[in-house]
Amino acid sequence: MNIEEFISSLAEKGISLSDRQLEQFELYYRMLVEWNEKMNLTSITEKKDVYLKHFYDSITAAFYIDFEKVTTLCDVGAGAGFPSLPIKICFPHLHVTIVDSLNKRITFLETLSDALQLEHTSFVHDRAETFGQRKDVRESFDLVTARAVARLSVLSELCLPLAKKNGVFAALKAAAADEELKAGQKAIKVLGGELEQVHSFTLPVEESERNIMIIRKTKSTPKKYPRKPGTPNKSPIEG
């Protein structure tokens, strides 16, 4: 996806980018590639691929979520900042919190955020399991996102405790196997959520499958969740 395709594909969805925003994406790309030589941030480094598989792919969440109605966003395990920072560039009013367990990645994100002059961004070096038990952040976010390979049952335990009542957890997945959704239903219910919709589509250019699962937080998460670090992965709420 070249820059022109990036601009026109987003414009078709009602997202028009200013010169300033395009400069921010360009700098994001350059810093990602530069820092990637020092640490493992991504295996995708070709410019056209970064714009499609990282930037555009992250922004697809805005095709199904009205970000004008979102103020606070928490991104769990965002790695190199996906999906939250491309979304933040498009919607500057957002207050974004990123939680990541690797300090090196947090250092990259802080440096990147300063270079892009992003306001209202905070980066927390913590495990999602511990962060989700913090009284000052638990059940406080309008939207919680995760673009990760972990199973839906595991992601739900890490993310739903952070969403406020009537807030949303959005899981961005490459492919949504029906069995993963079925296996995740119990966790979603136990944690106070309800599957609202699964949006399935293909990325332009390469036509690869993408799914965005929208889970609405309908009631408070029981206090014991998330369980201690490592437990959600070892024994997910399934069955």
Curated annotation (Swiss-Prot):
Q: Transmembrane region positions? A: none
Outline the segment boundaries, as ranges, of region: Disordered. 215-239
**Keyword Methyltransferase set for record:** yes
Record SUPFAM superfamilies? S-adenosyl-L-methionine-dependent methyltransferases
UniProt keyword annotation of rRNA-binding present? no
Taxonomically, what lineage is the organism? Answer: Bacteria, Bacillati, Bacillota, Bacilli, Bacillales
Q: Which GO terms describe its molecular function?
A: rRNA (guanine-N7-)-methyltransferase activity
- Output the superkingdom of the source species: Bacteria
| Alphabetical list of Gene3D superfamilies matching this protein | Vaccinia Virus protein VP39
Please identify the protein, giving its name as recorded.
Answer: Ribosomal RNA small subunit methyltransferase G
Q: Which family does it belong to?
A: Belongs to the methyltransferase superfamily. RNA methyltransferase RsmG family.
Q: Which GO terms describe its cellular component?
A: cytosol
User: Chief subcellular site?
Assistant: cytoplasm
**Keyword field:** Cytoplasm, Methyltransferase, rRNA processing, S-adenosyl-L-methionine, Transferase
Compartments where located: Cytoplasm
